Regions:
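ASCE RecA-like P-loop NTPase motor cores
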Residues: 1-168
Length: 168
C-alpha cells in the first residue's frame, strides 16, 4: 500500500499509476487480503470507508441507462477508445472498460440491461482472451460523494463563484 501523494507540485498529472496501485491494494484489502506491506505514512492517511465496486456478471441485469454516470462517479473517464486503466467507452450496447484492478480491459456485450458476454482482451495486440463469467470493477478514484453531497458541494461552489464575481 503506497502513500498518497499530497504535494501538488510533485503530482504527475498524466500518470495515475500510483493512485491505481493504491486503489488496487484497497480493493484487495476489502476482499480479505491477509498481508499488507505499507510504510507508516501510508497507514496514517485517510481511506474511504468503502471502496465502490461494480460487479458485472454474465446473464445478470445492470441499469444500462445509468452505467456511464455510475462509472464516471467511480472515477472512470469516458473516451472513444480504451487505451489505459481507468477508461471506458460505450458504443451502442457494448461497454469497453479497463478496470484499475485488472491486467487487461474487457468488452461487455449487453442485450438491453443484461450482460451477455464478458470478453477480456490484450489492449496492445487486440488478442481475445478466454471469456469470463464475472468482472469486478473497483473505483478509479479515492474521493467519493454520497447521494446528495455532490449537489450540495456544487451549490456551495456556485455560491462562492457568484460572490467572487460580485466582488470583481
Amino acid at each position: 500500500l503506497t502513500a498518497k501523494d499530497e504535494v501538488l507540485l510533485y503530482k504527475d498529472a498524466v500518470s495515475k499509476d500510483a493512485l491505481f496501485r493504491r486503489l488496487y491494494a484497497l480493493y484487495e484489502i476489502s476482499r480479505g487480503a491477509k498481508c499488507i506491506v505499507a510504510d507508516v505514512e501510508a497507514l496514517m492517511q485517510i481511506f474511504p470507508k468503502k471502496l465502490p465496486v461494480l460487479k458485472l456478471k454474465e446473464g445478470e441485469d445492470v441499469d444500462f441507462s445509468s452505467l456511464a454516470s455510475r462509472l464516471t462517479a467511480m472515477g472512470y473517464v469516458r473516451s472513444a477508445a480504451v487505451e489505459s486503466k481507468g477508461a471506458f467507452a460505450l458504443r451502442g450496447d457494448i461497454l469497453d472498460i479497463f478496470p484499475v484492478n485488472a491486467e487487461n480491459p474487457a468488452r461487455v456485450d449487453f442485450f438491453g440491461d443484461t450482460a451477455e458476454k464478458i470478453k477480456p482482451y490484450n489492449f496492445i495486440t487486440g488478442e481475445r482472451l478466454p471469456l469470463v463469467k464475472e468482472l469486478s470493477v473497483c473505483a478509479a478514484t479515492d474521493v467519493f460523494f454520497e447521494e446528495g453531497e455532490q449537489r450540495r458541494v456544487k451549490e456551495i461552489l456556485f455560491g462562492e463563484l457568484s460572490d467572487f464575481k460580485d466582488a470583481a
